[in-house]
């Protein structure tokens, strides 16, 4: 719309002024206030002469601001109470300036506080900061709970020939691995020998069911923290059932080694083993409440650490008896190299840069440094190895109950050292790793979450294109993760064949992966706790100062 501004001359010697009234120009005199336009409209007049320019610059009342705040270009609304309006505008101007000054001060303090927070994150953490907060008390409570979890392992079941059972235990790689997870509880036949394994099995089952059963999937994703608490409660109930089934299976497995296999012994043993597993699961939940790491992982970490000296001692004794010092040196070097390799791969990640609609840093004016989407190289963890080991032990378990010759031959071929053990194990690990990677990270779900947050990948359209791009990245990462897990699973078998030492069989690469992963996770939690202690001293929005 084109608006034409006409000039109305007040006197012959004064400047020309803009008037928005097209019907009748107002009359001016030397004491009246001029109702024109504010400078914020960007409208300027051009004087007709240098005398008019001088007159315009000397008149402070005409060039400061307009008296009326109503934009009325057609002159429909006339305001005769110019004095009250001028006073009211003056009050509003003063109040607005006051609040703008207050807002500017708050922004300055907020930016300075964020600067202090960034300096805290970048600064190194002193060892003395550990004793300034609640961390010492939390660690003492953690050590007490872990020690309490170990007591049940040293309370054995009665009436079992332990020497004969331990001799057969070394020949079964799967049970040896479970024995390392329980900290030697299976070998000692303790009442807490099942440990946290039934709870882990229940978690695996519910993770698989959440992808098949839509109600569980909605409960996990759409209901937030309340839904996750319900799933956790269902998992705890299911772990009791798994503990009962595994206790019955362990009692049946112990039948050849029991002196008096009676109904009373079976019932009492099943009840004790089930209660021991429930007690261990309860301790794991209390450990998780300390927020120093996952309680399940810390329990397994403690059991593996306690199993390590005995396993290494048996390996050293076997090497000295056979005079195989070269094999012992190879095992030590392989173990150290394995630890460093696991640390490197666990910390490796694929970073996809992200663009956010409104996430900019205050100082530089550009995107924040953390504007990327990280994907771990080994996002599936140890679950593919556990699934593969369980699958390889299935023929031996079925052959024990059925007695079929074909199952016995398959069990011999799929045991460590068998002809089909390595290729079958690697293929199963690759399959389960690919499946479990996409079970944890759904590309469509990730794409939808990025779209809701206003984030996008550069040169990739939001929606289906983003989901396809993420799927391609995860597929390539799963190949690297499968190769890494295959080395972990097949490495101990290769070292065993090269050194001819079997005492270290139960302590596989899976155990080292759990140790390293749990240690790094706990270190991150402690560092986050120390940083949060320093954040408590920062006042981000303090208006009184």
UniProtKB/Swiss-Prot annotation:
Domain of life: Eukaryota
Primary role: The central subunit of the protein translocation channel SecYE. Consists of two halves formed by TMs 1-5 and 6-10. These two domains form a lateral gate at the front which open onto the bilayer between TMs 2 and 7, and are clamped together by SecE at the back. The channel is closed by both a pore ring composed of hydrophobic SecY resides and a short helix (helix 2A) on the extracellular side of the membrane which forms a plug.
Name of this chain's protein: Preprotein translocase subunit SECY, chloroplastic
GO process terms (BP): SRP-dependent cotranslational protein targeting to membrane, translocation
Entry membrane topology: Multi-pass membrane protein
Any one GO molecular-function label of the UniProt entry: signal sequence binding
Tagged with keyword Membrane: yes
HAMAP family recorded: SecY (MF_01465)
Lineage: Eukaryota, Viridiplantae, Streptophyta, Embryophyta, Tracheophyta
Primary location class: plastid
Family the entry assigns: Belongs to the SecY/SEC61-alpha family.
């Amino acid at each position: 719309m084109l608006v034409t501004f006409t000039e109305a001359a007040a006197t012959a010697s004064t400047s020309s002024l803009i008037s928005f009234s097209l019907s009748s120009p107002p009359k001016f005199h030397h004491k009246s206030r001029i109702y024109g336009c504010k400078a914020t409209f960007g409208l300027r007049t051009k004087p007709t002469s240098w005398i008019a320019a001088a007159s315009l610059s000397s008149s402070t009342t005409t060039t400061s601001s307009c008296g009326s705040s109503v934009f009325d270009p057609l002159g429909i609304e006339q305001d005769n109470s110019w004095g009250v309006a001028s006073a009211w505008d003056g009050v509003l101007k003063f109040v607005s300036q006051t609040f703008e000054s207050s807002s500017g001060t708050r922004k300055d303090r907020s930016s300075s506080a964020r600067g202090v927070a960034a300096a805290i994150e970048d600064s190194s953490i002193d060892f003395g900061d550990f004793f300034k907060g609640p961390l010492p008390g939390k660690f003492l409570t953690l050590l007490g709970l872990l020690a309490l979890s170990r007591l049940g392992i040293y309370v054995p079941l009665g009436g079992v020939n332990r020497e004969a059972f331990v001799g057969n235990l070394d020949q079964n790689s799967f049970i040896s691995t479970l024995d390392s997870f329980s900290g030697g509880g299976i070998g000692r036949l303790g009442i807490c020998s099942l440990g946290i394994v039934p709870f882990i099995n229940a978690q695996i089952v519910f993770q698989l069911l959440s992808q098949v059963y839509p109600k569980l999937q909605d409960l996990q994703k759409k209901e937030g923290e309340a839904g996750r608490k319900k799933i956790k409660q269902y998992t705890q109930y299911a772990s009791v059932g798994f503990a009962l089934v595994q206790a019955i299976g362990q009692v049946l497995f112990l039948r050849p080694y029991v002196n008096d296999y009676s109904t009373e012994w079976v019932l009492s043993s099943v009840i004790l083993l089930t209660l021991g597993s429930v007690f261990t699961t309860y301790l794991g939940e209390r450990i998780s409440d300390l927020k120093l790491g996952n309680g399940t992982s810390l329990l397994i970490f403690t059991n593996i650490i306690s199993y390590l000296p005995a396993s290494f001692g048996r390996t050293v004794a076997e090497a000295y008896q056979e005079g195989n010092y070269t094999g012992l040196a190879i095992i030590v070097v392989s173990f150290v190299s394995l630890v460093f390799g696991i640390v490197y791969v666990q910390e490796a990640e694929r970073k996809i840069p992200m663009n956010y609609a409104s996430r900019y840093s205050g100082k530089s004016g550009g995107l924040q440094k953390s504007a990327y989407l990280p994907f771990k190289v080994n996002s599936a963890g140890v679950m593919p190895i556990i699934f593969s080991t369980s699958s390889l032990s299935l023929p031996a378990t079925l052959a024990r109950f059925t007695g079929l010759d074909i199952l016995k031959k398959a069990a011999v071929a799929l045991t460590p050292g068998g002809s089909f053990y390595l290729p079958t194990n690697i293929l199963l690990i690759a399959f389960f790793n690919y499946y479990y990677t996409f079970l944890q990270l759904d590309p469509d779900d990730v794409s939808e979450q990025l779209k809701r947050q206003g984030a996008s990948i550069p040169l990739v359209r939001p929606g289906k294109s983003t989901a396809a791009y993420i799927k391609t990245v995860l597929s390539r990462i799963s190949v690297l993760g499968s190769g890494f897990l295959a080395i972990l699973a097949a490495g101990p078998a290769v070292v065993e064949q090269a050194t001819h030492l079997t005492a270290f069989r139960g302590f596989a690469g899976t155990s080292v992966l759990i140790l390293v992963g749990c240690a790094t996770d706990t270190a991150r939690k402690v560092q986050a706790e120390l940083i949060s202690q320093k954040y408590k001293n920062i006042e981000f929005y303090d208006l009184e100062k």
